[in-house]
Amino acid sequence: MQTYTIKPAQSVRGEIAVPGDKSISHRSIMLGSIARGTTTVCGFLRGEDNMATLNAFRAMGVDVRDDGETLRIEGKGLAGLSEPTDVLDCGNSGTSMRLMTGLLAGQRFFSVLTGDQYLRNRPMKRVLEPLSRMGATIFGRAGGDKAPLAVVGRGLTGVTYASPVSSAQVKSAILLAGLYADGETEVTEPHLSRDHSERMLRYFGADIETFAGGVKVRGRELTGRDITVPGDISSAAFFIVAALIVPGSELLIKGVGVNPTRTGIIDILTAMGGSIELLNCREISGEPVADLLVRASELKGIEIGGDLVPRAIDEFPVICVAASCAEGRTVIRDARELRVKETDRIAAMAVNLRKAGVDVVETENGMELIGVERLEGCTAESFGDHRIAMSMLIAGLAARGEITVNDTECIATSFPNFIALLEKVVVP
């Protein structure tokens, strides 16, 4: 088991670029594989999750060439994938499993999806239910709620589905299945979740229409495109919080994706009093991008809920760290989805922050915590979750003493060079 010990920092300073966006990287492989013609991808995130997606499509006959800088995908068209000869292993990636389940439901072959011990215990019925309404045949453990999942490809029919949860994975699985369905497929959700699938489908030429509260798609061949993947705001979030909570810090993070469905982290931290400027705003491959200038700030506790939650769902572990260093009480609500991530992120952060001296009260769908003047040194657990591990390492920068995080191998899931980048900007 790998461990890493972080010491308190004097400041966080410099200029960095974070790795490519994980969500966009997944989708570039999927859509590039089922489009006609060649797709090139610059800035692809070579983390374990994205490599699981890449390897799955290679196993279905897609030629993906990687020269270390650019991926070149020779698309097969909607009906061109081949039946895999082995189980498709999604590793720790819920995005890979849920989105591929939707895509595979419309194929004319049999496939099986599995993952690691954590992924095999995450809920899948939220995807299987709407796909079954479209005519998909999918089997899984626990009545279809747990992987491995066996997908028997067949003809699909478009549906109108009101998702009870705001989940980009659920929405995207249905939209991908909708590419293969007869008629129109429509999805609505309580609050708008990240819209990378809609943007990229439109960029690839899909017959897609967005409207207030939802999206519609009809089957049509896609055309390969050139994609430049922006920096992942979920990865940038760790460095944003680091620069905010360590006095004397100033950090420029270049080329970050600032899709409005993902900038909840900026809105939350700004509402807490954080100094975050968006510079050099532009659009690349259908996605808004900016450079972020972050300066150390005195943060104050706030209430977080409603439509902010799906716009910052992956950033809540490090938001909890920011709240722990803020003056006063922070209340997080409407975030029950955090309990079914790679681990129960509400419980995991509560355990770790209590070790660091924070007064934390868990609720069913969130938590309440009171910030402290300085976190205490401690030994924290990652619980096998990359975002928990990185969040607690950021906490260590603002602690009185060292924070050691156990089981840090999981960081490679989404951010293989996190430690190296952190060491580059921390002034000890």
UniProtKB/Swiss-Prot annotation:
Residue pairs linked by disulfide bridges in the UniProt entry: none
Pathway the protein takes part in: Metabolic intermediate biosynthesis; chorismate biosynthesis; chorismate from D-erythrose 4-phosphate and phosphoenolpyruvate: step 6/7
Residues holding 3-phosphoshikimate: 22-23, 27, 167, 169, 314, 341
One GO location term (cellular component): cytoplasm
Location in or out of the cell: Cytoplasm
Function of the molecule: Catalyzes the transfer of the enolpyruvyl moiety of phosphoenolpyruvate (PEP) to the 5-hydroxyl of shikimate-3-phosphate (S3P) to produce enolpyruvyl shikimate-3-phosphate and inorganic phosphate.
UniProt name for this protein: 3-phosphoshikimate 1-carboxyvinyltransferase
Source taxonomy: Bacteria, Pseudomonadati, Thermodesulfobacteriota, Desulfuromonadia, Geobacterales
Gene (name only): aroA
